[in-house]
């Protein structure tokens, strides 16, 4: 992991005091996000989370824009209370709880997953196209995948005598799958939509770590949620979530099942 820069807490405290936030000191806040710096601070009647983008300033505006998009789409996310363009940090709501992965295989997961699907369908029903949001290129995705396959085959060619034919076979299969992929219109996508990037608090699901929101394959996020490589759900749970997603997105369930696998 790359070394992190130290944020200037005195400047942050002065900024907050100039905005009439009367705070004491700062507490460390553990997070899995390696490039972000979090600090917890308290006023007389509320707790606030300071999120610094000092280590990756380019994410600062992306995070603010993505937050505005989520809120406009009726997707719950921690509210930005204040921000500093100069020091590249935001002050946001703090929820005194870990991410939703702590509820995996616990009773609460039965409420969390349907709420997550509802949040996702809200995200994917944009009232307008948002300018300045990246659209993933389908051609580039295919090109990268093919290059990766060629590199793999070339590396093991001396061991795999049928390397040439294997390469051709995989290419044909990938191209056929990509032709199926091309029929989809890119939609707003979180990119890492699974329990680790959700917070369950006061019976609501909040989406976090959303600065990379972009336009991509419409089934990417629902696939990430239901078929998470780090945890698996029963066939019954998967089926219920797919039915809910299909109903809210007005999709044919049979076609959805075929496309998502």
PLM features: residue spans?
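An alpha-helical support segment within catalytic cores of ATP-dependent transferases
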Residues: 8, 12-17, 128-135, 145-188, ...
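Short secondary-structure junctions
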Residues: 16-24, 73-75, 181
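ATP-binding glycine-rich phosphate-binding loop
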Residues: 21-39
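ATP-binding pocket architecture of kinase catalytic cores
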Residues: 30, 39-143, 154, 182-183
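Active-site acidic catalytic loop and adjacent metal/ATP-binding pocket
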Residues: 36-42, 123, 175-220, 232-236
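Short, glycine/acidic-enriched loop or turn micro-motifs at the edges of active sites
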Residues: 85, 96, 195, 212-214, ...
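Short, intrinsically disordered, charge-balanced linker/junction segments flanking boundaries
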Residues: 252-261
